[in-house]
Amino acid sequence: MLSSSAASCTSPNPDTDNPDKKVRWSSEKRRRASSTDSESKTHLDISKLPRSRRPSRLTVKYDRGHLQRWLEMEQWVDAQVQELFQGQADTSEPEIDLEALMELSTDEQRTQLEAILQDCPGNREPFISELLSQLKRLRRLSRPSK
């Protein structure tokens, strides 16, 4: 029976000049290489990995479609707000927090939006109506889908 311990094995060609020389096992070399490999994996460019190997912690909690709808909604809101405030160069555009609006009732949402957009020079009513209708179709991000 073969033994796997280094102490019980001797080299077939012993080195008489250096009796303290020990046998290096190939598994030790592999073990060392694997520890350095795991360190180098943390420094890899994630964009070069295939999609199946990319870390997807965010999409574990929320599905991609839901996140995409939120992103499209936020981009639409930003574009509409820019269009509403197009005539005013010195006024900063207001921030509309969709998550905070989702927590409110429809009447409170309308009141909040009117307060945020009170300095808007354009007609804000069509934007508010469209935003409220889109918010009804959008689910909250704080409640992940199962």
From Swiss-Prot:
Residues 1-57 are annotated as: Disordered. InterPro entries: CPI-17, CPI-17_sf. The keyword ATP-binding does not apply. Residues 1-16 have a biased composition (Polar residues). Disulfide bonds: none annotated. It is found in: Cytoplasm. GO terms for cellular component: cytoplasm. Keywords: Cytoplasm, Phosphoprotein, Protein phosphatase inhibitor. Belongs to the PP1 inhibitor family. Inhibitor of PPP1CA. Has inhibitory activity only when phosphorylated, creating a molecular switch for regulating the phosphorylation status of PPP1CA substrates and smooth muscle contraction. This is Protein phosphatase 1 regulatory subunit 14D. The lineage of its organism: Eukaryota, Metazoa, Chordata, Craniata, Vertebrata.
